[in-house]
Amino acid sequence: MHSPLEIPPRWQSVPATSLIIALALLVAAASELLGKPFVLDWLAYTPVEFTGRRFELVPPGDQYWRYITPVFVHFGLLHLVFNCLWIWEFGWRLERGLGWTHCLGIFLAGAIVGNGLQFWWSGPSIFGGLSGVVYAFMGALWWLGRVRPGWVIQPPSAIFTFMWIWLLVGLTGVLEIIGFGAIANGAHFGGLLAGLGSAVVITSLHSKPGAH
């Protein structure tokens, strides 16, 4: 049985979390209607440019939206669905406890750092998905649960255990071998670091949580 506070809220009461999921679904719909190449041309971290001799993937440069937008691009239905489910599982807890501005801040930190570290990790390549933000949310929840118990509603400890194991297994290459596709380890670790760092900043700024 859940206590009333543990019951997930309606989407209207957690606007930041709901917006993140809605944008991912919108981009997925655009990919179906307009084609994945069109969407990637606008949202991928590394745009394709003609460098004088051939077409190459290049860094985002001053196309600042690209530091964030790859998180909304998914490669397959399961990729989209599971990431959105994890965003909801972690996001509503953060947003209910800390307010939408802090939740959005953790999202932005997770997206920017996760995408940046993935680019450094893999070099110019096409990558995407909300998994880095998932780990940012998870990392923030994990830290808050240990440093400031009671600030946010914590998920079952088994979920944290699963997420830590998944993070480490991803490094082994086993998931790619058994058909899960390429794993964005850089995004996972970057998002996790961003989430932990964001939680440290939040706890240092506030003696108690509040809606912002």
Which residues does each predicted region cover?
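A detector for small-residue-rich transmembrane helices and their helix-helix packing motifs
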Residues: 1-212
